[in-house]
Regions:
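A basic, amphipathic helix-loop patch mediating RNA/tRNA/ribosome contacts
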Residues: 10, 64-97
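Bacterial Sec-dependent N-terminal signal peptides
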Residues: 14-32
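Short capping micro-motif at the N-terminus of alpha-helices
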Residues: 60-62, 104-105
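Ferredoxin-type iron-sulfur electron-transfer modules in oxidoreductases and energy-metabolism complexes
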Residues: 65-78, 106-196
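Mid-chain, structured segments of secreted extracytoplasmic proteins
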Residues: 87-111, 117
Length: 196
């Protein structure tokens, strides 16, 4: 004969109060979120922007907090510039603004009117690759290719700014661009080839 399982009044009260609390929490949390949403998520401040990217002028409306990286990838669909760390530590998002390299994840789009932005898509001349792009192919300056656009943009700046007198100087200039695959020797060789 099977023993009948009995539940005490105390067990019933504990179980039902925990269950009712879980039923109440989501509604209360949503109500609290709705009350605080205006303080947590500030409204977008859309502003008109006229920016020149790869020698082409764009007129767009963008949130004043939009980074250059997000403007390029999300709004203009120029996806050659990569989002790596989104904290300015890996160099995958490197582009040129008025000929100087910048990390597009740390640059606000609102700072760009009147400036010229060049991305990896703007380096080539039609179907003719930039000499640095050709050198990266010839010297195996990439492996998986994810960091390559940022590496090439920094490498072009390295040559243009004259940081090519020694391997140590090239490595120092390029130290802000990380390559998880370890193609650093090919990258340095590519820069030296273009610098000749």
């Amino acid at each position: 004969m099977e023993a009948k399982q009995s539940y005490s009044r105390r067990f019933f009260l504990k179980t039902s109060s925990v269950a009712s609390a879980f039923a109440f929490i989501p509604r209360k949390a949503k109500a609290l979120y709705d009350d605080l949403k205006q303080f947590i998520i500030p409204p977008k401040e859309v502003m008109p922007l006229t920016v020149t990217i790869n020698k082409k002028e764009y007129k767009i409306n963008a949130d004043s907090r939009t980074t250059l990286l997000d403007l390029l990838r999300e709004d203009l669909h120029l996806t050659g510039t990569k989002k790596g760390c989104d904290h300015g530590q890996c160099g995958a998002c490197t582009v040129h603004v008025d000929g100087k390299r910048v990390l597009s994840c740390l640059t606000l789009a609102a700072m760009l009117p009147g400036k010229n932005v060049t991305t990896i898509e703007g380096l080539s001349d039609g179907d003719k690759l930039h000499p640095m792009q050709e050198a990266f192919i010839t010297c195996d300056g990439f492996q998986c290719g994810y960091c390559t656009p940022g590496q090439i943009m920094s490498a072009v700046a390295c040559v243009n700014e004259g940081h090519i007198h020694s391997v140590a100087e090239i490595k120092e200039f390029m130290s802000g661009n990380l390559c998880r695959c370890g193609a650093y020797n090919g990258i340095v060789e590519s820069i030296q080839k273009v610098a000749k």
